[in-house]
Amino acid sequence: MKKHIRVLLALMVSGVVLASCTTREVSCTLKGRIHDRNSDTLILKRATDDPRFNQVLIPVRDSAFEFTIQIYHPEAYELIFKEELERGSWRPVLFIAEKGEISFELYSNPDENKITGRNLNSVLAEYNKEFLGMFRPKADPLNDSIDALFQKNEYFSAEMKLLQSELANAGDNESRMALREKMEDLRSTGNDLSPRAKDLTRQGDSLRAEATRWRYKYIEENPSIVSYYFLLNDLRYLESSQANIEEIKSLYPVFAGKYPEHAYTEIMRSMLEGHDAIKVGGSFIDFSLPDLDGTVHRLSDIIGGKYALIDLWASWCGPCIATSRSMIPVYEEFRDRGFTVCGVAAEIDNTDQMRARIEKEKFPWINLVELDHKNHIWDKYGVSNSGGGTFLMDNEGTILAINPDAEKVREILSEKLKQTF
């Protein structure tokens, strides 16, 4: 949680990409040395990917590494120290994958890192220098205050500290899942923090708003892939970025027209489509996915004019599984009255854990597979940065509720279906 404020800089100092796209692959070679830390593995990923997906492991030998990737167009990538990712708190090394060689000097203090390459990484360095010169003097005092709260064990609220203690002593997975769900409830209401931590969070929000205004001035004055990446990053982290969705929407056609073949164009199209459609009163977005046997199903065919719950989940997401489990009695109660559930699991590399979880939980409805986020379903449904979500629809495909609990689903179905059956 120390990154709660420190992530301020990580989010504000986004990656910079500046070049035209190419339709053929070119080589990008990464060469680097690591100083003042014992690390044996780096994780390479696109900056737009979840670190749990599409990882490439780069071995570190004698404090040095070298790796070559093939790219179709300049794009922001990240290097993450494996041990940091495993701890659950990491600061990625952001760079621009471009044709040629990129050199890295990586230190235990990330602020000392040096990245040199061709034009794009020079632009990145200049942008970050200007940005940090403006905002670091304002951000550092917030970081120091947060550190002081942690040292005095005064960052979290009493309720949150109690749950953390119980989680540390929980003996089984089911208990841990229940405790994590309670902790998430506290976070959603802001009651996970002490009063002083809440005040510092408000100051951080104000600073981020100022940084966002500065960044959008840069975007407007520099309509390049630099700005395109900023738009995408803000859309992915819309709640925390404090970006204006209408401003993003108005700028997107400019960039999509200029870079129609860039990967960012399709990602943003899917996310903006979901933002417009996926809301109470909006309509579901149709898709086709395979089940565990490989048979492809279209969502609209599964729903077939019924009231339906779309359940996006993952075998590694405890709160998602708890939500899915809670819906089983509701499904059994209303399945013969015009209600169905369609599960979609976001899985990594393979479906082994999904298959095992379904067998354990005995989910009685169909479950489809979104493997490695290939179809952008989470983007389309506005849950890019979470394990999943649920969406209740009526028999015409209109969304009635987003992330309702089981009792809310039962309440809505009881009202809507009482005169039908």
Give the ranges of each region predicted by the language model.
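Bacterial Sec-dependent N-terminal signal peptides
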Residues: 1-32, 419-421
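Thiol/disulfide oxidoreductase modules built on the thioredoxin-like
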Residues: 363, 370-418
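Helix-turn-helix repeat elements of alpha-solenoid scaffolds
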Residues: 203-210, 242-248
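Conserved redox-active cysteine motifs that mediate thiol-disulfide chemistry
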Residues: 307-308, 312-329
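Amphipathic alpha-helical repeat scaffolds of TPR domains
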Residues: 221-237
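N-proximal helix/coil linker or "cap" segments that precede and/or mark the start of modular domains
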Residues: 245-290, 295-306, 332, 349-359, ...
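Structural microenvironment flanking redox-active thiols in thiol-disulfide oxidoreductases
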Residues: 322-361, 370-379
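A non-transmembrane, solvent-exposed segment enriched in polar/low-complexity residues
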Residues: 21-201
